[in-house]
Amino acid sequence: MAKPKSPSRRELLTNGVKAAGVTCLAGLALTAYVESASKAEAKALRPPGALPEDDFLAACVRCGLCVRACPYDTLRLAEMGEEAPLGTPFFVARETPCFMCTDVPCAKACPTGALDRDIPNIRKADMGVAVLVGHESCLNYKGITCSICHRVCPIRDEAITLEVQTIKGRRMVIPTVHSDKCTGCGTCEKHCVLGQAAIRVLPRELGLGGRGRNPAGRAV
């Protein structure tokens, strides 16, 4: 059997340069991705007590302690391609909402102050705001009374109320979000009976309209 031919020094150098080039390009791509993600419009829901997004990103060290402290596995660290900058904590309301622990263990676990450890009351948390985005799909707008989002709301009759409205000559019971009371916990979105939730929780700066009104029509 012929002895395998050993690669020449030139081949070794060439392969080494190619590998270094690939590694360099991958590193540049990752750096560009992280930079672009950090500058992207905030779309992720942050843990309770989070600082304003820019301050939060500056203070968060991506340690994951808040994720480990959450007893309901609500929080997770963002992976590449997700809606939050890489390694930062966020949650997806449709999957697992915030259960609004009164002792706020996630915030207390934060070592840098990216989450306010002295948040006085979980009801003062500002994770986002619920918005009725699917008027055409919401059962109430079809004349079918559905009160799921109202019934599951942990601040029922304050954050979400049911109001009788006359729409196109028909009296309907419509869920109405009061943005000054909503914490953005996401329980309403989680339990919406539709395949694609008609009510969604968005970061407050996205969920509120330009004139200080919730897109559903409620004043801030």
Swiss-Prot record:
UniProt keyword list: 4Fe-4S, Electron transport, Iron, Iron-sulfur, Metal-binding, Repeat, Transport
Residue positions binding [4Fe-4S] cluster 1: C60, C63, C66, C110
Disulphide-bonded residues: none
CDD domains: DMSOR_beta_like
Domain of life: Bacteria
Binding of [4Fe-4S] cluster 3, residues: C138, C146, C149, C192
Function of the protein: Involved in electron transfer.
Name by which UniProt lists this protein: Methylamine utilization ferredoxin-type protein MauM
Key word Zinc-finger present: no
Gene name of this polypeptide: mauM
Pathway it works in: One-carbon metabolism; methylamine degradation
Molecular function terms from GO: 4 iron, 4 sulfur cluster binding; metal ion binding
Binding annotation for [4Fe-4S] cluster 4: C153, C182, C185, C188
InterPro entries assigned to the protein according to its UniProt record, in alphabetical order: 4Fe4S_Fe-S-bd (IPR017896), 4Fe4S_Fe_S_CS (IPR017900), MauM_NapG (IPR004494), TAT_signal (IPR006311)
Species of the source: Methylorubrum extorquens (strain ATCC 14718 / DSM 1338 / JCM 2805 / NCIMB 9133 / AM1)
Domain 4Fe-4S ferredoxin-type: 50-80, 88-120, 173-204
